[in-house]
């Protein structure tokens, strides 16, 4: 049987959740001979190689693995997988996401029903449990993104990706590469179709000093690629996406209680909100601190660039 579908999953230092991600992908209702999973390890330093070896031996479907010895970045990892793919339909799944058994079938059906080039997208739902991810009592729709293309849960034909030019590897190590590719896909006239039955579950571990520190570091890295993204697309749409307007800065200040909430006490405030029966307020406060870290990173890069230009003069 010919492989129809290639699942593209880049990963870095997510060994525990990666094992569950691959277990879920190997348990799809789609015939195991009809799809493959390609995992590209972006220079992990944890137990990822051992997890990949065990998953490859245990899975019903074919799992192919590649390793980037140095941290080449997520755009480069996805591009490597796309070039190596044998399936014409590419489905993007992140390594901290878990797919219900009907997930791939829903994506395949979406494309079979359309004769045109399309992007199929589905909901991304938060789950707090790795043991019973699809029944987690804290689950709720997380991704309300209206971006044209997002790699959290999307599928399209490999030939279309090649025509659009793949992901921009200069957006290293990650950040904005999906939006950037989305602009090119939109220019090609590609339609989007939203399938509610193609949901995927995104694992969010409980907030802790370790996970919060990792989230802050992620925002700092995202900020590093923002100037390059804006340089490529200096539009008002991108200005809004990057939260670079005075209104966004004011809104963030309000969200952080005019500086009362900061990285040093955000977790304590989130715990208070949980005790008061308002966990949503806690998440809102934490999100404000994370956004402030991103905005500070972008502002620092911009100031550094202005200083360099003055020195050059």
Residue ranges of each PLM-predicted region?
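Glycine-rich, basic loop-to-helix element that forms the pyrophosphate-binding segment
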Residues: 68-85
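Cell-envelope/extracellular polymer assembly enzymes that use nucleotide-activated donors
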Residues: 3-6, 36, 180
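N-proximal low-complexity "stem/linker" segments adjacent to membrane-targeting elements
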Residues: 1-27
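A conserved acidic beta->alpha catalytic loop
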Residues: 24, 41-50, 70, 94-97
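Conserved donor NDP-sugar-binding/catalytic core segment of glycosyltransferases
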Residues: 98-133
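Short aromatic/hydrophobic "clamp" motif used to bind/position activated sugar donors
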Residues: 90
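Catalytic core of nucleotide-sugar-dependent glycosyltransferases
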Residues: 200, 210-238, 288-303
């Amino acid at each position: 049987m010919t492989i129809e579908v290639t699942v593209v999953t880049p990963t870095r230092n997510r060994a525990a959740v990666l094992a569950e991600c691959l277990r879920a992908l190997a348990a799809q209702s789609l015939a195991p001979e009809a799809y493959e999973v390609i995992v590209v390890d972006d220079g992990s330093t944890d137990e990822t190689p051992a997890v990949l070896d065990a998953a490859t031996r245990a899975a019903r479907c074919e799992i192919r693995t590649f390793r980037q010895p140095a941290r080449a970045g997520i755009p480069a990892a996805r591009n490597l997988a796309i070039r190596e793919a044998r399936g014409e339909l590419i489905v993007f799944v992140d390594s901290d996401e878990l797919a219900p058994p009907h997930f791939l079938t829903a994506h395949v059906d979406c494309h079979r029903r359309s004769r045109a080039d399309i992007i199929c997208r589905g909901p991304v739902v938060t789950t707090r449990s790795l043991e019973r991810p699809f029944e987690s009592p804290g689950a709720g729709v997380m991704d309300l993104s209206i971006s044209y293309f997002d790699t959290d849960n999307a599928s399209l034909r490999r030939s279309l990706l090649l025509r659009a030019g793949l992901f921009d590897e200069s957006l290293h190590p990650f950040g904005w590469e999906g939006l950037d590719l989305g602009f090119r896909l939109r220019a090609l006239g590609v339609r989007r179709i939203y399938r509610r039955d193609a949901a995927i579950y995104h694992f969010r571990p409980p907030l802790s000093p370790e996970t919060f520190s990792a989230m802050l570091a992620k925002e700092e890295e995202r900020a590093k690629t923002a100037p390059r993204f804006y340089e490529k697309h200096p539009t008002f749409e991108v200005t809004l996406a990057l939260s670079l307007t005075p209104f966004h800065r004011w809104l963030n200040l309000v969200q952080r209680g005019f500086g009362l909430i900061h990285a040093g006490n955000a977790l304590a405030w989130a715990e208070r909100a949980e005790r008061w029966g308002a966990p949503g307020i806690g998440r809102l406060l934490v999100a404000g601190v994370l956004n402030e870290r991103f905005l500070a990173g972008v502002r620092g890069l911009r100031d550094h660039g202005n200083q360099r230009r003055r020195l050059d003069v």
